[in-house]
Every structure is written in structure tokens, then in C-alpha cells.
């Protein structure tokens, strides 16, 4: 593995880890970063899947006690079974739509310009949602604990997650903001979003690796391993930071970041500085 490829792997791993669980779209950032770094060949898709796996394993490690409690409690505890059922219910819509429209979405939307429009649109939605939260004043959210989620709440969040099939919209942003609009406390919506990422990303990883297993090679293992570790470490730090951040802040700063980043992508693209308008 040459040093330039190692640097690209490290950068992309950190980008994935820092953006997977923030409402800013990790897929959108990887598409833009991959284009800037000229890391867009057939191995790039498999690499993206590997670093996403690194990021999700960071969440599994952060919530290992909770996950262990749920798994061990499935035979005997109703709350563990209800939580597991809610995760399954919320996961199904995105899986179904993803399988149906995967090729269309990748052909039409997996490039920087569509990502830019989605970033801006998502930022506007977050600003509207936060404005709506402020107008409600000190009204207490209906769902204050992730264990109090009902099946209908889970389904609503799962439907919101479908917007994340559009690169640039953000899976975490769709589920967190959607959850808040549907009556979930900010921390509850954020934690449920973390748990929803586990089956979605594990499923996507298994699907993509099965489909592109022939792209895996001994020569690529070093690159994949470096990106994986970078994604794990940065995602672990980011999850811990985000949980502290939301205790005292809303998501307005992320909304303005999305809008600014999206407009910058469009400005750079349409100015001719970089050729990514197609």
C-alpha cells in the first residue's frame, strides 16, 4: 500500500466516522470526498461498505451493555422483545424501498450535485423542525425513554428513514428529526437512530460484500483495514460527543453547515473549478 492510498483511506475513514451519526449525511460526504480524492473506482464501493462497518461497530461497542441486556432478555423480558420488535419494524421500510430502487437511486443521485441539493433541502427541513420545537416552548415530549416507544412510533421513524435513501439527506438526520416531529424526546430520537443504524448497516454490508466479494483481495486488505480503524475510532469519539452536545444544544448548527456545504459544492461545480456537474 503506497502512502498516497494510505492517506486517502485514512481521510475517508475519518470522514465516515465523523459524519455517520451526525445529521449531515455520511454518504453525501463520502461521494464528495471520493470525487475530490479521485477515489471512485470499483473498489471504492466496497471500501465504503467496510468503513461503514467500522463506524457501526463503534456504536455497538458504546452500547454493548444495552445490546447485551436486550439479547439476553429476549426469552424472558417483554421490554426487550418490544424494543427488538420496534427496531425491526423501523428497519423494514428502508430495506424494501432500498432493494426496489437501489439501481435507480445510484444511477441518478450518486454524484456531488444531487448530494448538494439534498444537503440544502435537509438543512432547511432541520431549521423548520427546530423552529417548530421552539414555538412549542417547554412542552414535554410524549416519549421520554426509548423503551416507551410504541410500534406506530417505530413505523413512523422507519418511514422517515426512507428519505435517507437519497444521498445527502442523512439517515441519522431523517430518523432523529423525524422522531422529534413524531413526539420523541431529542435524546430518545438520537439513541433510537443509533440502534436503527445497526441492522441497516450490517444488512447493507452483508449485501454489498456478497455482491462484490470478487473485489476483495489481499492487496486491498491494508487499505480496507486502515479505513476501518479510522472510521471506528472517529465514530466512537463522535457518538460520545454528540450525546453530550444534544444535552444542551439543538441541531440548528448542523442545518446551517449542511446549507453552507451544499451551496459550496454547487458554487465550485458550476463555476467550473471542478468537473462534477454531471
From Swiss-Prot:
It is found in: Cell inner membrane. Pfam families: BacA (PF02673). It comes from the Bacteria. It is an enzyme of class 3 (hydrolase). GO terms for molecular function: undecaprenyl-diphosphatase activity. One of its GO terms (cellular component) is plasma membrane. The keyword Membrane applies. The keyword Membrane applies. The chain crosses the membrane at residues 85-105, 108-128, 188-208, 218-238, 254-274. It is a multi-pass membrane protein. Signal peptide: none annotated. Keywords: Antibiotic resistance, Cell inner membrane, Cell membrane, Cell shape, Cell wall biogenesis/degradation, Hydrolase, Membrane, Peptidoglycan synthesis, Transmembrane, Transmembrane helix. Disulfide bonds: none annotated. Catalyzes the dephosphorylation of undecaprenyl diphosphate (UPP). Confers resistance to bacitracin. HAMAP family: Undec_diphosphatase. Bacitracin is thought to be involved in the inhibition of peptidoglycan synthesis by sequestering undecaprenyl diphosphate, thereby reducing the pool of lipid carrier available. Belongs to the UppP family. This is Undecaprenyl-diphosphatase 1.
Amino acid at each position: 500500500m503506497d502512502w498516497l492510498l494510505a492517506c486517502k483511506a485514512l481521510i475517508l475513514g475519518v470522514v465516515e466516522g465523523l459524519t455517520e451519526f451526525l445529521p449531515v449525511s455520511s454518504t453525501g460526504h463520502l461521494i464528495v470526498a471520493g470525487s475530490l480524492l479521485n477515489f471512485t473506482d470499483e473498489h471504492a464501493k466496497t471500501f465504503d461498505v467496510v468503513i461503514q462497518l467500522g463506524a457501526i461497530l463503534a456504536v455497538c461497542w458504546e452500547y454493548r451493555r444495552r445490546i447485551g441486556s436486550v439479547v439476553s432478555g429476549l426469552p424472558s423480558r417483554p421490554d426487550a422483545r418490544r424494543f427488538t420488535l420496534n427496531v425491526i419494524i423501523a428497519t423494514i421500510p428502508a430495506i424494501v424501498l432500498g432493494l426496489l430502487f437501489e439501481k435507480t437511486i445510484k444511477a441518478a443521485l450518486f454524484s456531488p450535485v444531487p448530494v448538494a441539493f439534498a444537503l440544502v433541502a435537509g438543512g432547511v427541513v432541520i431549521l423548520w423542525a427546530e423552529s417548530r420545537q421552539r414555538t412549542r416552548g417547554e412542552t414535554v415530549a410524549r416519549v421520554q425513554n426509548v423503551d416507551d416507544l410504541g410500534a406506530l412510533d417505530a413505523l413512523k421513524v422507519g418511514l422517515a428513514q426512507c428519505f435517507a435513501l437519497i444521498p445527502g439527506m442523512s439517515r441519522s438526520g431523517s430518523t432523529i428529526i423525524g422522531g422529534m416531529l413524531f413526539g420523541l424526546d431529542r435524546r430518545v430520537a438520537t439513541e433510537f437512530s443509533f440502534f436503527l443504524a445497526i441492522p441497516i448497516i450490517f444488512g447493507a454490508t452483508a449485501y454489498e460484500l456478497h455482491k462484490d466479494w470478487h473485489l476483495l483481495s489481499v492487496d486491498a486488505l491494508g487499505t480496507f483495514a486502515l479505513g476501518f480503524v479510522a472510521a471506528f475510532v472517529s465514530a466512537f469519539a463522535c457518538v460520545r460527543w454528540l450525546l453530550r452536545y444534544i444535552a444542551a444544544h439543538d441541531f440548528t448548527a448542523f442545518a446551517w453547515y449542511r446549507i453552507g456545504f451544499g451551496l459550496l459544492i454547487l458554487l465550485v461545480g458550476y463555476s467550473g473549478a471542478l468537473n462534477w456537474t454531471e
